[in-house]
Amino acid sequence: MGGGGDGELSPAEARLAMMELANMISVPMALTAVIRLGVPAKLWAGGANAPLAAADLLPAGHPDPSVLERLLRLLASRGVFSEHTGSSSPSPRRFSLTAVGRTLVPGGGGSPSGSGASYADYVLQHHQDALVRAWPLLHEAVLDPSGPEPFARANAGVPAYAYYGKDREANEVMLRAMTGVSEPFMEALLEGYGDGGFEGVSTLVDVGGSSGACLEMIMRRVRTIRDGVNFDLPDVVAAAPPIPGVRHVGGDMFKSIPSGDAIFMKWVLTTWTNEECTAILSNCHKALPGGGKVIACEPVVPDTTDGSTRTRALLENDIFVMATYRTQGRERSEEEFRHLGLAAGFASFRAIYLDPFYAVLEYTK
């Protein structure tokens, strides 16, 4: 890079970098737009992924395909699409899905099993109107960290979880989004942790298990687990479907947690303060026998900050939690998670990295 005041960028390069940052909102909004237009599915076409021009992706007779082409070019620059240009001129630009883009279509990379899950709903859920309204109020989280999170401030005081409880359509998108994100990780968990990690477990409790889908996946793979307990708020488990071998139990994890040989939880600790996390883990400790363990799957931020995709994804998600769910909820480093477990009475801790985003955190009594 050219020389500059910071020894890395020239003044012109620094200004260019800031121009990119200032306009970065165009990237997720363009991504949301092409998903709503059905572009990834049209390109994928059951696995064909043949390069197509913008005009081919729109209804016949569309007055100006160049508008879509501009979105596709932007997303090609971000690695979502590959751009193909012919040797002759004029030749229309054509686009196909990259490995990143294929995560937006069922069976294209979002879920190794090809179950039908994808990351498309995750993108759509993050850019619903109610969530987008929160971002201009992000500075309020700094000025008043103990007050309502930006989402609630922007939506007449209604927190995100209450909003999803009232808006059926938004809730369905959110549930599909969580499925799309969860399935690939759960497959990685079962492949890399699987039978050995759940050895000796006959009764498994899933804290915050929602519909019980993750518990069902585990029990389908680990046949030694005979009794599954899907534990969540009463109104959540009331809507959960029947699952063979699974009992749906309603309650409050801050009061008590059902007993089991092991306790599983995924993305539960992120939205709580250190004190609240310690309370949750303390109740887990009480519910376990000697040698029992908590298997918590959480994003773990690195100790040092760099520009890698992994670090950016983790830190961006941390701010999403701040803006949407809980200002004082936060993602943590491995050492911070270790201290939470020790404070709750656990004898040992280890972190297992099976996925670039989630880590498996093992707390043993």
UniProtKB/Swiss-Prot annotation:
Catalyses which reaction(s): nicotinate + S-adenosyl-L-methionine = N-methylnicotinate + S-adenosyl-L-homocysteine
GO MF annotation terms: nicotinate N-methyltransferase activity; O-methyltransferase activity; protein dimerization activity; S-adenosylmethionine-dependent methyltransferase activity
Function recorded in the entry: Involved in nicotinate detoxification in planta. Catalyzes the conversion of nicotinate to N-methylnicotinate, which is a detoxified form of endogenous nicotinate in planta.
GO biological process, one term: biosynthetic process
Keyword Transferase tagged: yes
Binding site for S-adenosyl-L-methionine: D232
UniProt cross-references to InterPro entries, sorted A to Z: COMT-like, O_MeTrfase_dom, Plant_O-MeTrfase_dimerisation, SAM-dependent_MTases_sf, WH-like_DNA-bd_sf, WH_DNA-bd_sf
UniProt similarity note: Belongs to the class I-like SAM-binding methyltransferase superfamily. Cation-independent O-methyltransferase family.
Keywords: Methyltransferase, S-adenosyl-L-methionine, Transferase
Pfam families, A to Z: Dimerisation, Methyltransf_2
Enzyme class: transferase
EC number from the UniProt entry: 2.1.1.7
Name of this chain's protein: Nicotinate N-methyltransferase 1
Keyword S-adenosyl-L-methionine: yes
Coiled coil spans: none
Domain of life: Eukaryota
